[in-house]
Swiss-Prot record:
GO cellular component: central element; chromosome; nucleoplasm; synaptonemal complex
Stated name of the protein: Synaptonemal complex central element protein 1
Xref: PANTHER family: SYNAPTONEMAL COMPLEX CENTRAL ELEMENT PROTEIN 1, SYNAPTONEMAL COMPLEX CENTRAL ELEMENT PROTEIN 1-LIKE
Primary localisation category: nucleus
Described purpose of this protein according to its UniProt entry: Major component of the transverse central element of synaptonemal complexes (SCS), formed between homologous chromosomes during meiotic prophase. Requires SYCP1 in order to be incorporated into the central element. May have a role in the synaptonemal complex assembly, stabilization and recombination.
Subcellular location as annotated: Nucleus; Chromosome
InterPro entries: SYCE1
TM ranges: none
Superkingdom, taxonomy of origin: Eukaryota
Record's compositionally biased regions (Basic and acidic residues): 312-329
Disulfide cysteine pairs (residue numbers): none
Chain segments carrying region Disordered: 1-29, 291-329
Source species of the chain: Mus musculus (Mouse)
Subunit (UniProt): Homodimer. Found in a complex with SYCP1 and SYCE2. Interacts with SYCP1, SYCE2 and SYCE3. Interacts with SIX6OS1.
């Protein structure tokens, strides 16, 4: 029994079960095209008037169309299943995308925080490096200043030691000169020189008196005495005696003058040496106080400055030398 073709404009049976999708849309479009072709063929046959002989052909064509429709429905179901699976996978991928995007945002935030932290660390390291460089420069400057101060102190110490050695040598010379033995010897020499000069003076006086007596003895009476005196004065003996007397007198005067000058020079030298001894004693006392203060300051500043023991030793020697003259005097 042949089925009647459906009216135009009506959808075939089961078309309401078609789902939207790429494969279902292609199957639905193919089935609709075939049905429209059949309807066009029926209209053409109706117009021609030869519809009955073509019924079986139409039935066969309708069966083919139904089989194609069934096959398309199956393919559509499979496509719908694939579509659903793909849709689920798409949802999962979207969820994964959202999750990964959230992770990416957190990672980017962490990266930004780490970059800021790294920048802070770099700035801190640069600041510490600059501070370290400044500290090194300051330390080098202070070391140079310390070296300069040490050089100055060394130079001052050497100058002081040299000056102190000079004072000590002068003090020793003065001490040697002012020793009781030396002074006694000098006084003995002066006394002996004085006694020798006095003896020579007395001898010259005796010689002068002898010459006068001889002259008086040679005079005689008044008339003959003048003649004899004139003859004697004109004689070679009188000239030799006068010349000898003048020479002896001149030598005695020169010797007395030299002895007086030497005595005066010795007195002046003794006075100068006494003044010099007093001045050296005062300087030694003053330098002794300075050396003691300097040694105390060196002990206080020994954390960054080395103190030399030489000034202390020199101070001790100076104190001993000061004690010696005081004990001898």
């Amino acid at each position: 029994m042949a089925t009647r073709p459906q009216p135009l404009g009506m959808e075939p049976e089961g078309s309401a079960d078609l789902l939207h999708g790429p494969e279902g849309a292609r199957g639905q479009y193919g089935s609709t095209q075939k049905i429209e072709d059949l309807m066009d063929m029926v209209k053409k046959l109706q117009k021609v008037g030869s519809l009955e002989p073509r019924i079986e052909v139409l039935i066969n064509r309708i069966n083919e169309v139904q089989q194609a429709k069934k096959k398309a429905s199956e393919e559509l179901g499979e496509a719908q299943t694939v579509w659903d699976n793909l849709q689920k996978e798409l949802d999962l991928l979207r969820e994964e995308k959202v999750r990964l995007k959230d992770i990416l945002n957190r990672k980017e935030e962490t990266l930004r925080i780490m970059q800021l932290h790294c920048q802070e660390k770099e700035s801190e390291a640069q600041r510490k490096h600059s501070m370290l460089q400044e500290c090194k420069e300051r330390i080098s400057f202070l070391n140079s200043q310390i070296d300069k101060e040490k050089a100055k102190l060394r130079k001052l110490r050497l100058d002081f030691e040299e000056h102190l050695e000079t004072l000590m040598s002068q003090h020793k010379d003065t001490l040697e000169f002012h020793k009781p033995e030396h002074l006694t010897k000098e006084m003995c020499v002066l006394d002996s020189s004085k006694e020798q000069l006095l003896k020579e003076e007395k001898l010259m006086k005796v010689k002068l008196e002898d010459v006068r007596q001889r002259l008086c003895a040679l005079g005689g009476p008044e008339g003959s005495s003048s003649l004899i005196e004139g003859l004697f004065l004109r004689s070679h003996e009188a000239a030799a005696a006068m010349q000898m007397f003048k020479d002896e007198n001149k030598k005695a005067e020169e010797f007395l003058e030299a002895a007086a000058q030497q005595h005066e020079q010795l007195q002046q030298r003794c006075h100068q040496l006494q003044q010099k001894r007093q001045r050296l004693k005062e300087e030694l006392e003053k330098h002794g106080v300075q050396i003691l203060a300097h040694s105390t300051q060196n002990e206080e500043d020994s954390s960054w400055r080395m103190a030399s023991p030489k000034p202390v030793e020199v101070h001790e020697e100076t104190a001993q030398d000061q004690e010696r003259p005081s004990s001898r005097t």
